[in-house]
Amino acid sequence: MSSNRKDDHVRHAVDQHRDRTPVNDFDAIGFQHHALAGIDAADVDLGVDIAGKRWHTPLFINAMTGGSAAATDINRGLAIAARETGLPVASGSLSAYFRDPGLAGSFRVLREENPHGVVIANVNATATLDQARRAVDLLAADALQIHLNAVQEIVMPEGDRSFRSWPRRIEHLAAGVPVPVIVKEVGFGLSRPTVAWLRDAGVAVADVGGRGGTNFARIENDRRPAADFSFLDTWGQSTPACLLDSAEVTGIALVASGGIRSPLDVAKALALGADATGVAGRFLATLLDRGAEGLIETIRAWLDQLRSIATVLGAATPADLRRCDLLITGEVAAFCRLRGIDAAAYAHRSHWWHPSERRSLL
């Protein structure tokens, strides 16, 4: 991918997120309020175990960019924000680095500015094992993230048209790299059978990457001179739908990204079964508008607000949010009916009033 195209992606992605709060399927998910369910904020621990590491928070900065001068500045700002807030951070696709090793610095800055944090290297599904290992080595990465973007590719005039080998390649990478593998969709969602297949292929984490956030089909369509693909603007499943669809798949961690707009969306995603949540476009817009200090301030506010939400809901850990009652309505409820998911059961999960569930007040 050329540096110009990388910069185009950044510009279009920011345009989708700046100065608006789009409606998405997280609006169809609500918490049933229980006025006596609250705990003490001091009892809330936001830490989670993901991909063999202890993360201080269930929130991370998801894959964005790299491979240009502008991308170097962006990655520096993201790395500084990650360092100061304790958030893990994922690189953009390292494809540009594989074509031109001279671009290494635009990615390596993520580790240079964040020497002790969790850094994740990102490659596409056609990366060779040698390339994947080089990506991990370049960033001293704690995990390898493989992105799936078939829909984006078909909208790109110059995009890939061959996807049959992707499953075999993913298995090869998962078996051959020295770090845990994360597989993420870029905004069109992972289905239940896909997540189960990834688990069986040796993948440690599935990032469902659902519809509702940055729309890469729309970004690529905006770059096309002809042959409009705007009919794909609503392709795929939303992040809440994907989490519900994969809730019963065991043996693999789930990450929610795609359409996370606020700390409340983070809490909803965790309550739907995510082990962690990733944010890309919204944090990118904040960085470009307010700089690294502005992003640090925003992330710290999100973490404080997430802790407050967990306190009111009586959730001492992110996993405890899965026992909170959820009201699932609208198109997400319709999706559940079609996929054989008991949405009503999510409204009757909590037992906060039972003596065995409450800490002594003494």
From Swiss-Prot:
Q: NCBIfam families annotated for this entry?
A: IPP_isom_2 (TIGR02151)
Q: What is its main location?
A: cytoplasm
- Gene symbol of the encoding locus: fni
Q: What is the lineage of its organism?
A: Bacteria, Bacillati, Actinomycetota, Actinomycetes, Mycobacteriales
- Enzyme Commission identifier(s): 5.3.3.2
Required co-factors:
FMN; NADPH; Mg(2+)
Tell me which domain of life the UniProt entry assigns to the organism this sequence originates from.
Bacteria
Q: Name one GO biological process term.
A: isoprenoid biosynthetic process
Q: Which family does it belong to?
A: Belongs to the IPP isomerase type 2 family.
Q: Extract the Pfam families matched here.
A: FMN_dh
A single Gene Ontology CC annotation of this entry is: cytoplasm
Q: Which reaction does it catalyse?
A: isopentenyl diphosphate = dimethylallyl diphosphate
Q: Where does FMN bind?
A: 63-65, 93, 122, 184, 214, 259-261, 280-281
Where is the protein localized?
Cytoplasm
Q: Which InterPro entries match?
A: Aldolase_TIM, FMN-dep_DH, IPdP_isomerase
Molecular functions per Gene Ontology? FMN binding; isopentenyl-diphosphate delta-isomerase activity; magnesium ion binding; NADPH binding; oxidoreductase activity
The protein's job, in short, is:
Involved in the biosynthesis of isoprenoids. Catalyzes the 1,3-allylic rearrangement of the homoallylic substrate isopentenyl (IPP) to its allylic isomer, dimethylallyl diphosphate (DMAPP).
The signal peptide annotation in the UniProt record is: none
Q: Keywords assigned by UniProt?
A: Cytoplasm, Flavoprotein, FMN, Isomerase, Isoprene biosynthesis, Magnesium, Metal-binding, NADP
Q: Does the keyword Nucleotide-binding apply?
A: no
Chain residues that bind substrate: 5-6, 152
The molecule here is called: Isopentenyl-diphosphate delta-isomerase
